[in-house]
Amino acid sequence: MLNKKEQRLRRSRQTRARIALQGVERLTVFRTNLHIYASVISADGGKVLASASTAEKEVRAQLGVAGKGACVDAAQLIGKRIAERAKAAGVEKVAFDRSGFAYHGRVKALAEAAREAGLQF
């Protein structure tokens, strides 16, 4: 029987296999207890085109002293930043790769903020 982490990794492998068949760039999300990370990866999977995370110095300063990287507000900020950076890199349409995490809470907030900022998926 698989533990919780192994189940998540299995789901993420299945998702990435489906996205690879589509042949589009993917917006991948990784979530920890402290931070959230987002990257836009090329269609062949070999190159990171844009990235953003709550571990960045500018983001931590913007969130303030009380602002933690592990909140919905921080995820929304990262969603907007990744959309801006992806558009600057010439990427308009992506496939959303939630890395096996549930589409809920911070992952959902990041996705919705990226959509509002103009990224299509």
From Swiss-Prot:
The keyword Ribosomal protein applies. One of its GO terms (biological process) is translation. GO terms for molecular function: 5S rRNA binding; structural constituent of ribosome. Keywords: Ribonucleoprotein, Ribosomal protein, RNA-binding, rRNA-binding. It comes from the Bacteria. GO terms for cellular component: cytosolic large ribosomal subunit. CDD domains: Ribosomal_L18_L5e (cd00432). Pfam families: Ribosomal_L18p. Part of the 50S ribosomal subunit; part of the 5S rRNA/L5/L18/L25 subcomplex. Contacts the 5S and 23S rRNAs. PANTHER family: 39S RIBOSOMAL PROTEIN L18, MITOCHONDRIAL (PTHR12899), LARGE RIBOSOMAL SUBUNIT PROTEIN UL18M (PTHR12899:SF3). Belongs to the universal ribosomal protein uL18 family. This is one of the proteins that bind and probably mediate the attachment of the 5S RNA into the large ribosomal subunit, where it forms part of the central protuberance. This is Large ribosomal subunit protein uL18. The lineage of its organism: Bacteria, Pseudomonadati, Pseudomonadota, Betaproteobacteria, Burkholderiales.
